[in-house]
Amino acid sequence: MPSEHRRSRVRVQESMSHEPEKDVLSEAPAIARHADPYISDDPAFGPEGKILFDLKVDAADTSDNSSRDEPQYDFDSEEFANIPEIIREVVGFEDDPTLPVITFRSLLLSAIFCTIGSTVSQLSYFRTTYAPFPVFFVILASAPLGRLLARVLPAYIVPLGRFSFSLNPGPFSIKEHAIIGIAANAGSQGQWATYLPTNAALYYGITMNPAVALFFGWGASLLGFSFAAMGKSELHAKREAKRMKVFWLILFATFVWQFLPEYLFPFVASLAPLCWFASRNHTVNFLGAGRGGIGLLNITLDWSNITSTVITYPYSVQVTVFVGFVITTWILIPVAKFGNLWGSPTYNIMSNGVFQKNGSSYPFTSLIYTDLNGIQHVNETRYEEVGLAYSGAQYTWEIFMWYASYISSFVWCALFLGPKIAKIWKARKAQGHYHKDRLRYAPILACLTMKEIDLLSVLIQKYPGMTLWEWVALTLVPIVMLLVIVALKKVWMPTWTYFVALGFGGAAMLPMSLVYAVSGYSIKVGFFNELIYGYMIEAKGSSRHPLGQLAYRIISGNVWYDARVVLEDQKIGHYLHLPPRDVMGMQILANIIALPVNYGVMRAVISSKYEYVSGQKVDPSGQWTGQDFKSYNTAGIQYALVGPKKLFASSFFKPVLYGFAAGGIAPLVIWLLHKKFPKVRFDLWNTTIFFASAATFYGNLSTGPFTAILIGTFFNFYLYRYRHKFWNKWAYISGAALDTGFNANLLFIFLFLGTTGAVMVNWWGNNAESIERCFAW
């Protein structure tokens, strides 16, 4: 019988342990990553993790003996020889091409979940902390909704000629379920491109033409076609009833609880015990406060400050991230502040803004003038009066860390993954052909993450694949779309720099994708892109508007941000026997649906929270800070308006360039230690992740990391190692429920309280002076 119709469960078993169970639905991204050539045996696991697991598929039908009909495969035979064991034991090797994929039901549910996901994700951009929209929730919710539609919709054929379709083609299929997950993930990522119209409105009083903003967003997002398939088998088994009940209970409890830290009782969002014992002592308050301080021993009961990364990140990654936090926030910040180092206290160490030499706010708008050709230049006379754009110590060494992270990704991959990459590439080159699947035009990346899967390639051949010309067309559409917008001077960047943005974005794709593949940790490339852009626009006649730098950063970054997901999820679609054209079509549809929603939410937040997110007032909760937008504006001022040539001529900024050297030396040291002491597992200490985590800005809110490492140690160290079956059964479903409950609460508060101007009265747990009761500020 077709494998899609089998009710199955996945038994996830670590190479050295026993039988934890997990649904393939929630395993799909991990399955794709675990097939990669470089696998670590770090004892933590998550959909974004890097642990090697043996996934074994057992029959799980609790109501019949359907498992007797399961085909038995001889995995020792030649036809399976080139298929990795982890893939052999998870995916099905039979396919029913008659199962419906794109139907009225899947389109309707995809549109609903895309709208919800894009709304929540866009709201999160304006907050200091947030929990990602969990696609796992979509998978859980779409199955019963799909079955409901299959029962209630009429079997009516909508007469549209060759495009006629049925409202109800029969039972809800696993392929419909999977395609909904693809669309929801593509549409719920949020749109980084909305940062451009947001910053234009917040800092320059410019309202971008909505059409330009939308087409710029579509072009940027379609550069890589981001999507993820989260499906292998449906949640049909009766044994799932208990887990689903627990999921909804946790979701509801989280939804109710979040009213306390987010609205009614914000005191619990940042418990600062040091402040309780010396609430009027400035030094103690700085050390203990999670808002504006370094959050030493600070505990949070707000899930947005924790998120499900305590479950989805491997434990080694969590430790690396926490070490980066400790070094920068608990050590370097106090040293700089109390030692009056790196510009402290003249430049606020807890700010990511820009300052004049005397510490006053930098008047960046007064430095910009536009010539008759519509090109923005620097008013050099005014610049001589204002001087260099300085930044606080924390933001300055953030640049250092990002430079180190960027270089480290290349060196790390060369040292730790280089031999494996070369071996696989030579083997595939010797074969004389590449996969006959949808990745055949990306052979380098395909060979890094997928071995020859002959039988699966045969199964997918029944579906028309994307031809070379179709790939070219799908690539040219967003490229031309963006080129027109850039050439018409709608995004303030010189046209020729657009092509450089594509080139540098492509160069970063390989090492950054590999780091993500083995860790689940996404590395930013923005600061390096800004440096390159800053030097390029030193050319005479180039626009120097800070928003041009942001447009360049968005375009260049999206090249690899989207490509990494395409690489991963093309494999998943391959494993699930999904028609390539259907997958592409749903991706495009998800982007078309999501972007107008993103734009509308962006305008709504600016309208209702403008004073907070623009920095004119301080949000009492410390959440609606818009700190990311401020960081991008600071970077635009320093790299585009002032320029790196002037910036790094200053002794204040010159040490930042040593970040490149640190990024090259650190992975080499770790590699040598790993070669000398392989049993110590120095290879788990990924320097790229360390530098990236150390570059995180904690000026507005430092509560969270301490609580997160405590919970992460409990989940991904103690439970994973010593209560593995319990962990595997409940960890992911709990994380998804907690994230979903938080996001539902966030959406409710914004729609029904935030937009209406409803303000919580002040009381002991919502003190007007300090919700943490740190009164020395």
Language-model-detected regions and their locations in the chain:
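Alpha-helical multipass membrane-protein architecture
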Residues: 2-777
